Amino acid sequence: RGLVGSEMCIRDSMKIVFATGNPHKLKEIQEIAGDGDIEFVLPAKGFNPVEDGETFEENSLIKAREAAKLSGNYSLADDSGLCVDALNGAPGIHSARYADTAQARIDKLLNALDDCENRSAKFVCAMTLVDGEGNLIYQTRGECRGEISRKQSGTNGFGYDPVFLVEKNRTMAEMSEDEKNLVSHRGKALRDVIKFIKSELM
């Protein structure tokens, strides 16, 4: 079996399962991907991976393989998180489970930093592409450095975006989608994956 099955490559286009249950992530991925050569779709019903890896890379591989197992299709997964220097890299791989709700996670983070002067942090995104049998094809990482603000600001984006300062005292949540996608950890990782797909699989 070749890298690209006939059912996968039709008129220079390709369908890839994006292993997430988060519609915000899928929307962001589709916007970054742009031109339509690659169509990203949600995983099949029953997608519920056990993310018990110890790194972003391990968890993204777990998710990609679970999606491929259900679909038999090329699958791409990301595992992302916020790593805060003063918290020894926390919340890290536990970013999505740091507290019960998005607002609670932000509140917990701001309380943990309190009056801390060192507010340096980075968003990390590990992306993993597997084939329909779950074999690892490509893995990459994107990072975006910034600082944690003292209060949340902005209504765009999701997750920790309202407290992540990127440039000119603007949080990610104050940026337009296009601006965010240019600098974000997920944008950097996905552009690298797409470059690989178009050069090696299409």
What are these model-derived regions, one by one?
Residues 2-10:
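Short, small-residue-biased leader/transition segments that mark boundaries at the very start
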